[in-house]
Structures are given as structure tokens and as C-alpha cells.
UniProtKB/Swiss-Prot annotation:
This is Uncharacterized 7.3 kDa protein in petA 5'region. It is found in: Plastid, Chloroplast. Keywords: Chloroplast, Plastid. Its main location: plastid. The lineage of its organism: Eukaryota, Viridiplantae, Chlorophyta, core chlorophytes, Chlorophyceae. It comes from the Eukaryota. GO terms for cellular component: chloroplast.
Length: 62
């Protein structure tokens, strides 16, 4: 019931915050992904997994 959309918005907000905090790191990561498309899907999945675990831990602590 529209839950997917709110989740996407939530992830987008987190992504924006991460980008503002870790701008150089993320820019470097993006350039690496552009250079090597073989790793890009794997790395993106890894980032998503890490973000999910981080958010779960964060939610438990607050």
C-alpha cells in the first residue's frame, strides 16, 4: 500500500545525507564503478546490504 514508495524516499534521504557527508568517497566510488561495470552491480548490492544493516542497527538504538 505505497510502502515501497516511502521506503524509496527514506533510502533517498539517507543517500543524500551520505553523499553530503562522504562526497569525495562517493565520487571516487562512482568513478570506479563507471570504469569497471563488471564490479558495479556487485558493489551496489554490497552498499545496499551495508546500508540496510546500518539502518537496522540505527533503528534498534533509537
Amino acid at each position: 500500500m505505497g510502502r515501497g514508495l516511502s521506503t524509496k524516499k527514506f533510502y533517498f534521504k539517507i543517500g543524500v545525507q551520505l553523499k553530503s557527508n562522504w562526497n569525495p568517497l562517493i565520487d571516487k566510488l562512482i568513478s570506479i564503478l563507471k570504469l569497471n561495470s563488471f564490479y558495479s552491480s556487485f558493489v551496489l548490492r554490497l552498499i545496499k546490504l551495508c546500508l540496510t544493516k546500518y539502518l537496522l542497527l540505527y533503528a534498534q538504538q533509537h
